[in-house]
Amino acid sequence: MAIKRVAIVGLGLIGSSIARAIDERLPQVAVTGHDASDDVRGVARDLGLCDGIVDDPVAAVADADLVILAVPVGRMADAAAAIAPGLKAGAIISDVGSSKAGVADALAKALPDHIIIPAHPVAGTENSGPAAGFASLFDGRWCIVTPGAGVSGDAVAAVTGFWQALGAKVETMDAAHHDMVLAVTSHLPHLIAYTIVGTASELEEVTESEVIKYSAGGFRDFTRIAASDPVMWRDVFLANKDAVLATLQRFNEDLTALQQAIRRGDGAKLEEWFTRTRAIRRSIIEQGQDDAAPDFGRKH
């Protein structure tokens, strides 16, 4: 099937980046945008995002071949219900949420299973809002597609081709497996970052000014992650709680083992652990998933 018109519901970082990428790389595709926030719609209009920004979600999806819900995962069910009356026959519904099994269930409450193709572009920054988006956000990044059993191959191919056209590498995956993988690679790191920064800010022995003044590179990396949209991440943790809790349990066990090694003065254990985990970093660089520049390419 050909995608000639796309509707984007939600014009934050991801939604606005999709709009910009379509404009740059798929200029023949018409784009209509909608956001529940009056302020966001106003900014989107000022920025010239999409071919049109509309106030009504039903009007936004009219005649769209592909509808992308770029809203926090906790709002997926409401967003699906809002657009359902305006969908044309044959339209595909997708999303960009960081959890997939729960999103699929939420969408299915308002929409037929056979038109839902959940997707997760594994890309982003700590910034949010329509002004934060940029067309190259998805370049070389993975987009994981988790179609249900009843979806046609043509529809899956259309969504796959769409994301590839925006610069992404596409992988098809079972929704539950996606949620476990992302709990390890994305959700738990964000939870740890929020915790470390929160702990540092509450230590009575260290003032906030000292935390800011003497922050080393590692701590600054955590603060960058902790600057991410709190509403979005609140919803992600709640939507993917089973996988997050399972991963957090394993992390706590490993952390306890390291705590015991430090207490015992077991340098061999610490070095073995650090050496093994260092290899993961090298593999990420080798696969082009990050910058090999010294100090993560940080400018001083």
Q: What residue spans do the PLM features occupy?
A:
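Phosphate-coordination loops involved in phosphoryl transfer and adenosine-cofactor binding
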Residues: 3-5, 90, 140
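Rossmann-like NAD(P)-binding element
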Residues: 57-87, 91-92
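Internal alpha-helical scaffold of NAD(P)-dependent oxidoreductase catalytic cores
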Residues: 137-224
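Rossmann-like NAD(P)(H) cofactor-binding subdomain of soluble oxidoreductases
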Residues: 79-131
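Glycine-rich, N-terminal phosphate-binding loop of Rossmann-like dinucleotide-binding domains
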Residues: 70-72, 97, 147
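Interdomain hinge/lid region at the active-site interface
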Residues: 208-276
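NAD(P)+-binding Rossmann beta1-loop-alpha1 motif at the extreme N-terminus of oxidoreductases
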Residues: 1-56, 61-62
